[in-house]
């Protein structure tokens, strides 16, 4: 009976995690037609539900002792540390609402770390684990693609009701079509859609590599009958990779475009140099195709190319402009060890006396709010996970990319404090963390067997 209950809890967690981005994206679309619909509150409630289901499963599991590991304890401690920061944020004169919103946006998504760490890990079969992980990634990319198609249609047509919506949401300064088309704001803002596009590129690359590997194996084993479906899947995810890249450039965010270009370089280095998976001639073909595309765009739409180039080359100057804001925020911290409290340097604190808002620079903002202790704990978690990813880069290159691009973009933007972006970030951390815990346990069991022998 208990085993059946655990199985039902686990299935419920799978389904809710699979549906999460689809439901949240639907919530954002609903804000267009339902005035006053709180998409952020809706997303927070879903995360609380996922946290509750995951926690119940962990408590009822027969192997819950397996989940007590250094990295899992550190992530849990990080959540608790930030939760109790409401004490010093209120002590520093900030209202509780500032803390609640920031906790919901940047820390509550950490529950997604425990989905693979506590749920997927219980599957004894590695193949079954991979299937579950793949299903969650596929659900994310399907939801993102549908959401992006709706966004692109509205961006291109720019109907007046959509322009009014963007103006009311403070995404644009004037409710007309020309202002609407400066960048694709979607329903979430251009920064969020940029990072999600980069994450979708990396998820697509995961499946491209998977199906390309299957094609290679089938060719070696003369299993040509299986090549049709595998090739179809490879083409689909290649198209999704390109589509996600286009979405990032339509969003017209500097950090997003740079991250997308770095992802292309990263994937090519892995495929042609690290993994040595493909012949170099394909690299030359790809380079030729990219050059040809740029030349064609320069001929057909030179204004778009010059606009993108101007955005990219302005990145160093933008960082220089924001550095003064960062230095001011750090120099005016209430306490170096514990920080100002979660939310004290966020947008919600604008207008509060004594607040030093870090409008762009998520990592600096995180340091100011969490202090040396909280930020060191966060950095330790990242370092442990990244170190583990390098032990099996073929398996984790997608997750590593999702993590590192979020950190890279958080130098000049507040990606790390965006509620919509953080679930995929923490899920990627959890996928690597779950296997790190499993490998440590296997090594321990092997040592015990050797002692007995």
Please identify what each model-predicted range represents.
Residues 1-61, 80-92, 406, 427:
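N-terminal signal-anchor transmembrane segment
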Residues 304-370:
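Long extracytoplasmic/lumenal interhelical loops at the membrane interface
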């Amino acid at each position: 009976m208990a085993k059946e209950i655990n199985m039902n809890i686990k299935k419920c967690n799978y389904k809710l995690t699979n549906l999460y981005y689809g439901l949240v994206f639907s919530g954002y679309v609903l804000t267009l037609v339902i005035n006053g619909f709180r998409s952020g509150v809706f997303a927070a409630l879903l995360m609380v539900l996922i946290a509750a289901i995951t926690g119940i499963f962990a408590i009822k599991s027969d192997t819950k002792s397996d989940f007590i590991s250094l990295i899992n304890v550190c992530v849990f401690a990080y959540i608790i540390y930030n939760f109790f920061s409401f004490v010093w944020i209120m002590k520093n004169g900030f209202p509780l609402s500032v803390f609640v919103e920031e906790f919901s946006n940047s820390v509550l998504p950490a529950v997604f770390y425990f989905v693979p760490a506590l749920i997927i890990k219980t599957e004894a079969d590695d193949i079954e684990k991979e299937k579950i992980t793949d299903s969650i990634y596929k659900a994310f990319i399907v939801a993102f693609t549908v959401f992006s198609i709706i966004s692109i249609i509205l961006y291109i047509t720019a109907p007046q009701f959509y322009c009014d919506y963007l103006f009311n949401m403070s995404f644009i300064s004037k409710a007309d079509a020309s202002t609407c088309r400066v960048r694709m704001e979607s329903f979430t803002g251009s920064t969020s859609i940029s990072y999600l596009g980069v994450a979708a590129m990396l998820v697509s690359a995961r499946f491209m590599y998977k199906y390309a590997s299957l094609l290679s194996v089938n060719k070696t084993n003369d299993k040509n009958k299986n090549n049709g479906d595998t090739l179809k899947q490879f083409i689909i995810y290649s198209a999704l990779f390109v589509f996600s890249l286009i979405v990032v450039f339509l969003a017209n965010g500097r950090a997003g475009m740079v991250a997308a270009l770095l992802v292309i370089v990263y994937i090519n280095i892995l495929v042609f140099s690290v993994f040595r998976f493909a012949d170099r001639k394909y690299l030359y073909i790809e380079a030729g195709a990219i050059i040809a595309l740029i030349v064609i765009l320069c001929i057909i739409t030179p204004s778009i190319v010059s606009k993108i180039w101007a955005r990219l080359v302005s990145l160093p100057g933008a960082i220089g402009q924001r550095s003064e804001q960062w230095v001011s925020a750090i120099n005016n911290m209430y306490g170096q060890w514990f920080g100002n409290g979660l939310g004290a340097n966020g947008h919600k604190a604008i207008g509060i006396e004594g607040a030093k808002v870090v409008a762009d620079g998520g990592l600096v903002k995180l340091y100011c709010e969490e202090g040396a202790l909280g930020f060191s704990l966060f950095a330790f978690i990242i370092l442990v996970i990244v170190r583990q990813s390098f032990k099996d880069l073929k398996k984790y290159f997608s997750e590593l990319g999702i993590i590192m691009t979020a950190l890279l973009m958080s130098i000049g933007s507040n990606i790390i404090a965006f509620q919509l972006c953080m679930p995929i970030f923490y899920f990627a951390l959890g996928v690597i963390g779950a296997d790190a815990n499993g490998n440590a346990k296997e090594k321990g069991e092997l040592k015990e067997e050797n002692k007995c022998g």
